[in-house]
Every structure is written in structure tokens, then in C-alpha cells.
Curated annotation (Swiss-Prot):
Domain EngA-type G: 3-167, 207-382
HAMAP family: GTPase_Der (MF_00195)
Highest taxon above the source species: Bacteria
Protein name: GTPase Der
Domain KH-like, residue spans: 383-469
Pfam families according to UniProt: KH_dom-like, MMR_HSR1
SUPFAM superfamilies: P-loop containing nucleoside triphosphate hydrolases
Gene3D superfamilies referenced in this protein's UniProt entry, alphabetically: 3.30.300.20, P-loop containing nucleotide triphosphate hydrolases (3.40.50.300)
Xref: PROSITE patterns: G_ENGA
Record keywords: GTP-binding, Nucleotide-binding, Repeat, Ribosome biogenesis
């Protein structure tokens, strides 16, 4: 496995800027406001030929109470404990501050390997701050500029001996979606007339799950309960998680990567620039996930923003699980559950049959049901149906309810096959596909859900005409050139 590097330092010394440079993507929020990064955040970093995990920590604040700064400080200490190496950043232009000295002492006690770096050291104005850094007792500081990429060669030299102690870890990739089925594999599968097994999550390719919802729905509390440790910031302040945090866990024997996203508010309420960045981060987490857990607040479920989040996940083609949190404080549970199911079917018909489970992130009740629902949704998302079974089913559907004949043109549905998985995608060859009403499409999709046990997952149904394979269909004939017109004119 690769080593882990934690970037630590007081607020606004350039930790997130360096994190983004190492990761190669804008994965951490960057702003001039101190304390922008409020959670521990992991990414796969590249530095030359080195590959390692980097943690962007909350800014070290000299606070010990239960304030947000105090919790940030405790999380940073947790990052130091998790890491193999700590990169301690100071601001060379500001020089060594009393806060830097306090936390240099903490790092000496808690971390076996500390690399000291004087960031923002471009130009002669930083020389005095670099010299002051020697007084911290952490060795010779590296002169760096995370913004301009200076000092990375020196950082490489420091990390190379560490890297040699660890095996290289293969870079993680985004989950495969809209997987086109191989024709040869399809033939073998169809001959067996069996539903293919769902790919089993592994440590190298864990099941990727995004937990999304409105602010303060309990997303971080839920994940902390699954983890069994206080990894993410939790508290009464709405919108406390501003980044989409990715965590690898083993949940009941299933390797998973879980994304805890920023609470998605209505656009009208997203005033602060940072929160706008976080909402887009949450949308991106949905795209990275295979299964999306939409977490609702039992007291105010299915608000407009909840519906938009669930619809977004469906449009992105992800498996969806609806989880209703704070169930422990509900009094009339049976009546409430009945009302929730009725509202779900009425407000989100496109997710008909998706799992709806009740949980309490505070007490941990219902987590086993949530795990089972995620695994079921993932299984359905990967579902494959034999072509022969599809065409027998199609014949029955046509007999039960023949397609309409718009403008007197009879639509013939001739053949059906599955073209994709993740989510399931089907193709029907027919005449006049452009004339097929949307209501008949829904009839077929709902039938697929019920008859092949595919509740809740997005199902893509494409109608194709007989001539769709003709590459010249719809192309204009080439017009005669001027030379050709001239020659034909001379002949006449």
C-alpha cells in the first residue's frame, strides 16, 4: 500500500492550494477566508513517479473548547495520527507565529516523521520567515510556493525514502457506468438464460456510495456512526460540511468508498461563494458514485430540494436509496411511514420501487437495513436480462396492450435486447420510433421494473427504426461541382 501524507498548518498558509497541486484536480475548496477546509480530506497524489495518499487537514487553531475551531483542531490531531508523514506548512511571509510554535510542539510529540516547509517563499520578502523556521526545531525548512509549484523537487527528495518503504498503490478510477455489453459475451450469456452475477466490490474497486441531502440532514453523523469514529465534523450548524469527503471503509464485509457531500440548499439560499463551490462538489460526488443515498430529515421530508437531488441522481443514471433520518424522535412511526411511502410514490414516480428505509444516525438503528438496501440497489443497477426472455416478455406486453397507431400509422415492435448495464439500458427495434408516445414508453419501463425485479433503478429504453444502422440515412446527396456542371453543359 502507499504511504499517507498529512498537510497540516494554521489557517490560510496554503494547505489546500498545495493539496490541489499534488492531486492535480481542484478537489479542496480554496478561498482567502481562514478555516475554509473544515474536514479531513483524502486524495490520490502524484509527485514525479511517486504515488501516495494526501490528507488536507483543517487549519490548526489554538482552541480547545467545543467551538468549531476546537473540533477542527482535534480533527487535525486525528490526521497526524493517521499519517505516515506530516508536512507542516508555515507562511514564510508572515514568519513564525506563536500558534506555529504551539503546534510544532504537538507535531514533535505526535508524529515520528515531520517535514517542515516554508510556503509562499517566492521573493526576498520571505527570507526572514524562512530563517525563523529553523527555530522550530524540526530541521531545515523546504522553501516552497504551492501556488507556483516551487520547491516540489525538494519535497520529492524528502518523500522518496518514505516511498521506498511502501508498495505502490494503483490509482483509483471513477466507477464504470453505461457499460456497453460485449457481443461475444452477450451470446454466451444469452445461451445460458441466466441473470449475470453482480460484480463483487473489492479493496481495489470498492462500491462507491454518495450520501447527499439538504444541510443538517445528518449525513456526516450517519457516516461517523458507520465508521465508528468521529471522522467528519458534526454539529448543529447547518452546512457544516463544505467539501465532498471521500472515505474508504469496510461496512459489514463490503469494501466501500463513501462520499459525504455538502448539504445542497436551494439556489436562492446559496449566497456565500464557498457554499456555491460545495454544492457543485456534491453534484460531482453523485457522478463519481454507483449508489446514491438521498438522506431526508423525518421532520421535513420531500422538500423541493430533496426532490431535485433525487431527480439529479436518476438523470445521472445512478442507483438510488431513500433514507429517512432522525427516526428515533418520531412518535407516530407507523402513520408517518405510510405517509412517507405515499408521498414517495406520488412525488418521485421515476424512482418507483426504490428502497425507502428509516434510520437513526444518532443511535445507529436501521443501519443494517440501509446496508441491505444499498447492496440490493447495486445488484439491480448491474442487472442483465437474456435476450430470449426479453422478447418473450415483449410479446406478452404487446398482446396485453398493443401500441397505438398515431395518424393511422401502425407501430410494430419487432425485437428487443439489452445493450448496457449500470444502469440497465434496452433497445427495441420498431417501425416509426419517432411516433411512439411517451406513455407507451413508461408502460414498457414499468413492466420491466415489475417483471424482472428492477425496482428503483434508472432504466433507459431506446427505440430504433430499421434504417437507423444506415450510415447514409439523412445525409444529403452531394451537389454537382462547378467543373462537373461545366463538362455536362459542353456535352449537351
Amino acid at each position: 500500500m502507499s504511504f499517507t501524507l498529512a498537510i497540516v498548518g494554521r489557517p490560510n498558509v496554503g494547505k489546500s492550494t498545495l493539496f490541489n497541486r499534488l492531486v492535480g484536480k481542484k478537489l479542496a475548496l480554496v478561498d482567502d477566508q481562514p478555516g475554509v477546509t473544515r474536514d479531513l480530506r483524502e486524495g490520490e497524489a502524484r509527485l514525479g513517479d511517486l504515488r501516495f495518499t494526501v490528507i488536507d487537514s483543517a487549519g490548526l487553531e489554538d482552541a480547545t473548547d467545543n467551538s468549531l475551531e476546537g473540533r477542527m483542531r482535534r480533527l487535525t490531531e486525528r490526521a497526524v495520527e493517521m499519517a505516515d508523514v506530516c508536512l507542516f506548512l508555515i507562511d514564510a511571509r508572515a514568519g513564525v507565529t506563536p500558534t506555529d510554535e504551539v503546534f510544532a510542539e504537538i507535531l514533535r510529540k505526535k508524529s515520528a516523521h515531520v517535514i517542515l516547509a516554508a510556503n509562499k517563499s517566492e521573493g526576498s520578502a520571505a527570507d526572514a520567515g524562512v530563517l525563523e523556521a529553523y527555530g522550530l526545531g524540526l530541521g531545515e525548512p523546504i522553501r516552497m510556493s504551492g501556488e507556483h509549484g516551487e520547491g516540489l523537487n525538494d519535497l520529492y527528495s524528502e518523500l522518496l525514502p518514505v516511498s521506498e518503504k511502501f508498495e505502490k498503490l494503483a490509482e483509483e478510477t471513477a466507477p464504470e457506468t453505461d457499460v456497453v455489453l460485449d457481443e461475444d459475451e452477450n451470446e454466451a450469456f444469452n445461451a445460458g438464460e441466466e441473470i449475470a452475477a453482480t460484480p463483487v466490490p473489492t479493496l481495489e474497486k470498492p462500491l462507491q456510495v454518495a450520501v447527499v441531502g439538504r444541510p443538517n440532514a445528518g449525513k456526516s453523523t450517519l457516516i461517523n456512526k458507520i465508521l465508528g469514529e468521529d471522522r467528519l465534523l458534526t454539529g448543529p450548524e447547518a452546512g457544516i460540511t463544505r467539501d465532498a469527503i471521500s472515505l474508504k471503509i469496510d461496512w459489514s464485509g463490503t469494501p466501500m468508498r463513501i462520499f459525504d457531500t455538502a448539504g445542497m440548499r436551494k439556489k436562492a439560499k446559496v449566497q456565500e461563494k464557498l457554499e456555491k463551490l460545495s454544492v457543485s462538489d456534491g453534484l460531482r460526488a453523485v457522478k463519481f458514485a454507483e449508489v446514491v443515498v438521498v438522506l431526508l430529515d423525518a421532520a421535513i421530508p420531500f422538500e423541493q430540494q430533496d426532490l431535485r437531488i433525487a431527480d439529479l441522481a436518476e438523470r445521472e443514471g445512478r442507483a438510488v436509496v431513500i433514507a429517512v433520518n432522525k427516526w428515533d424522535i418520531e412518535d407516530e412511526k407507523q402513520e408517518k411511514l405510510k405517509a412517507l411511502k405515499e408521498a414517495f410514490e406520488r412525488l418521485l414516480p421515476q424512482l418507483r420501487g426504490a428502497p425507502l428505509v428509516t434510520v437513526s444516525a444518532k443511535t445507529g438503528r436501521g443501519l443494517d437495513r440501509l446496508h441491505a438496501a444499498i447492496m440490493k440497489a447495486h445488484d439491480v443497477w448491474n442487472r442483465r436480462v437474456p435476450t430470449a426472455a426479453l422478447n418473450r416478455w415483449l410479446a406478452g406486453m404487446l398482446e396485453q396492450h398493443p401500441p397505438p397507431a398515431p395518424q393511422g400509422k401502425r407501430i410494430k415492435l419487432r425485437y428487443m435486447t439489452q445493450a448496457k448495464t449500470r444502469p440497465p439500458g434496452f433497445v427495441v427495434m420498431c417501425s416509426h420510433p419517432d411516433k411512439m408516445p411517451a406513455s407507451y414508453n413508461r408502460y414498457l419501463v414499468n413492466g420491466l421494473r415489475e417483471d424482472f425485479d428492477m425496482p428503483g433503478t434508472p432504466i433507459r429504453l431506446t427505440l430504433r427504426g430499421q434504417g437507423d444502422k444506415n450510415p447514409y440515412k439523412g445525409k444529403k446527396k452531394s451537389t454537382p461541382s462547378r467543373l462537373r456542371k461545366h463538362l455536362e453543359g459542353r456535352k449537351s
